[in-house]
A protein has these predicted regions:
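Structured beta-strand/loop patches that form or line metal/cofactor-binding pockets in enzymes
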Residues: 151
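Conserved glycine-rich "GG(E/T)P / GGGxP" loop and the immediately following alpha-helix
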Residues: 1-148
Length: 151
């Protein structure tokens, strides 16, 4: 026997009412760009009110536009920026402008939020990797923590 299907009311976020003993974090990512959501700022507020910390994964294209909202959100704990997304998705944006926005966000977030730059394209589209790595070194001199196991 299967439990009955239930739907949440339209005005209630899916994480409302969950209890902290089950998890401390909410992850905003997967199957879409969370920075595109028109209610992102409100979701961050609600997450904080419920006692959650948010980890957000983005392709980075909207970081410049959303920087103020993200940095002002107490619930936002960490931002993962998938730098490989630029080459893999054919974004209609200048590459240098894209990198400047991603790296500028990281510099503005220093000491306030955790920022993780991801470059997960080994064996795929990776011709931009040398330029990305040079840009990272220019903005964030080494040593870095490099994690190659996908953790």
């Amino acid at each position: 026997m299967q439990p009955p299907v239930q739907f949440l009311p339209r005005n209630r976020p899916a994480f409302g009412g969950y209890d902290a003993p089950f998890t401390d974090f909410l992850y905003f990512h997967l199957m879409g760009e969370p920075l595109c959501h028109p209610q992102l700022e409100r979701f961050l507020e609600l997450a904080g009110e419920a006692g959650f910390r948010v980890i957000l994964t983005t392709n980075g294209t909207l970081l410049s536009r959303m920087q103020e909202v993200l940095l002002a959100a107490p619930a936002l704990h960490k931002v993962n920026i998938s730098l490989q997304a630029f080459e893999g998705s054919g974004m209609a944006m200048d590459f240098d402008t894209y990198l400047a926005g991603c790296f500028g966000f990281g510099q503005a977030a220093a000491g306030k939020k955790i920022v993780c730059y991801r470059l997960w394209n080994r064996g795929g589209l990776d011709s931009c990797n040398p330029a990305i790595l040079r840009g990272l070194e220019g903005h964030f001199p080494q040593p870095w923590v490099q994690e190659r196991r996908g953790i």
